[in-house]
From Swiss-Prot:
Its main location: nucleus. The keyword Phosphoprotein does not apply. This is Polyadenylation factor subunit 2. SMART domains: WD40 (SM00320). Pfam families: WD40. It comes from Schizosaccharomyces pombe (strain 972 / ATCC 24843). SUPFAM superfamilies: WD40 repeat-like (SSF50978). Keywords: Chromosome partition, mRNA processing, Nucleus, Repeat, WD repeat.
Length: 509
């Protein structure tokens, strides 16, 4: 049957996953007043039915492993697919903003992950974006050296030619009065946000500056460059305070610890490592390994000061817990990867959890939801993916293709399908119990019942003799009757030992 030209195609309905944090948050607000003391720890039971009792990550602040976002939720992609360079959650956590290589900003719903808005904001590729601390402004940099101001509705209000080459990173000051930009021209610039004027130009790197971050509460800048150096700057005078020489290749991103004192700086590099520097000692205290190729991005958990996540150029995602003893993490990693040679060290740390096949290509950007229950990643494979923490006793969360790989997951899926088909096509034989019960009424039957597995058991005396069962009170009952006739002999019952002709017991007369 031919379809009319203007007929509407009815698409097949599909289920859409959603991660609604409202129920857990409301339950936490109600029950937090019932805690015995402020040190009370809520522990979810390992049962899928306990998902209704799953509280926000803040309730499990003493156990950061309960909030490792390793469960795949959804993949979002535009109709015209392009490389995703930037992912940023809005300050209220209701939407996600992504910036692509074509200069487009896309807004995605934070609950159902569906498309909401697309805006052609830049003429060049979007390289960086950052929300102000109060959430009222968004600034972004592109491949043409432009910095643009946006309102929350993505209305462009100002354009600044900040650099002659690509703007690689931007960061706001703690009070939103200034911001800093890093560029491929080898310099950093400090700007007055309200006046849009340049205040300082920081030079000292010998090559492209790939990243910059402003300390959440101090007048301190950290930058990373293609010259393998990490530098700290004073934004008031423009002088270089210190230089760190830990990495052996290009620094891809530097990020200060959010909140909780912000005493640490995490940096990732193309030397396949992530280093955590202590600002008080000005040296690295942890070296995070586990990536086989370049590490492109890093993000701190918004609620746990000791949990951070990295994304690699091979599409892998690694979660690290800084509280875990290094030797213990090395032992666990060696059990998973016995072919990898490890060097025991007091500061080498390996992943607490891994997603080896999170994306098909390199990951350029990642960020946690403000509540900490979701992780978003943007990749060179032109997709944006959402990850959440595992549910109680969720054994299937690590059995998908993102953890096992395409080939192994397909093999496991084919095995499951074969097992289901075998169960559907199963035709049971004649029930042996029916034949056994039929033989039980056979007078010639002797021995035990013919049950499966008991055929070789020795025979026992049969309860049947000459077709009559030897049961007290039923000596004259036959198997053909449904009910046994009462015996004509006197039954010995206390108080009824003898009976008169009129039917009354003699001892009651």
């Amino acid at each position: 049957m031919e379809r009319a030209e203007n007929a509407r195609i009815i698409q097949k309905p599909m289920t859409r996953r959603t991660v609604d944090y409202g129920s857990g948050l409301s339950k936490y607000i109600v029950n937090r007043h019932l805690r015995s003391n402020r040190y009370h720890i809520h522990v979810p039971r390992p049962n899928p039915n306990q998902i209704i009792n799953l509280y926000p990550p803040y309730e499990y602040k003493y156990n950061n492993t309960s909030s490792l976002c390793t469960k795949y939720i959804h993949t979002s992609a535009n109709k015209a697919r392009h490389v995703i360079n930037v992912v940023r959650w809005t300050p209220d956590g209701r939407r996600l903003l992504t910036g692509s290589s074509t200069g487009e900003f896309t807004l995605w719903n934070g609950l159902t992950f569906n498309f909401e808005l697309i805006n052609q904001s830049h003429d060049y590729a979007v390289r960086c974006a950052e929300w102000s601390t109060d959430g009222r402004w968004l600034i972004s940099g592109d491949g043409g050296g432009m910095v643009k101001y946006f309102e929350p509705n993505l209305n462009n209000v100002k354009i600044v030619q900040a650099h002659e080459m690509e703007v690689r990173d931007v960061a706001f000051s703690p009070n939103d009065s200034k911001f800093v930009t890093a560029s491929d021209d080898g310099s950093l610039k400090v700007w007055n946000f309200h006046m849009s004027t340049e205040e300082l130009k920081l030079t000292g790197h010998g090559w492209d500056v790939k990243t910059v971050d402003w300390h959440p509460s101090k007048g301190l800048l950290a930058s990373g460059s293609k010259d393998n150096l990490v530098k700290f700057w004073d934004p008031r005078t423009g002088t270089c305070i210190a230089t760190l020489h830990g990495h052996k290749n290009t620094i891809m991103q530097a990020s200060f610890q959010k909140n909780f004192g912000s005493n640490y700086l995490a940096t990732v590099s193309r030397d396949s490592t992530c280093r955590v520097f202590d600002l008080r000692a000005m040296k690295d205290v942890r070296v995070l390994r586990g990536h086989e190729k370049d590490v492109n991005c890093v993000t701190w958990h918004p609620l746990y000061p000791n949990l951070l996540t990295t994304g690699g150029s091979d599409g892998s995602v690694n979660h690290y817990s800084l509280d875990e003893p290094p030797l213990l993490s090395q032992q666990k990693y060696h059990e998973k990867h016995p072919n990898v040679t490890l060097s025991a060290s007091s500061y080498l740390l390996y992943p607490t959890a891994e997603i080896p096949f999170a994306h098909d290509l390199g990951i350029w950007s990642m960020q946690y939801h403000p509540l900490g229950h979701l992780l978003c990643t943007g990749s060179n494979d032109k997709t944006t993916r959402f990850w959440s923490r595992s549910r109680p006793d969720d054994k299937e969360s690590t059995m998908d293709r993102h953890h096992l790989g395409e080939e192994q997951s397909e093999a496991m899926l084919s095995q499951r399908k074969a097992a289901i088909e075998e169960d559907d096509n199963y035709e049971p034989d004649e029930n042996p119990l029916t034949e056994t019960l039929a033989n039980a009424h056979n007078p010639q039957f002797s021995g035990v019942l013919n049950l499966p597995g008991l055929g070789t058991m020795p025979s026992f005396p049969s309860p049947y003799q000459h077709g009559q069962p030897q049961i007290p009170g039923m000596l004259h009952a036959s198997l053909s009757n449904s009910y046994a006739e009462p015996s004509t002999q006197n039954s010995f019952i206390p108080g009824l030992t003898s009976k008169s002709q009129d039917g009354y017991p003699q001892n009651y007369r």
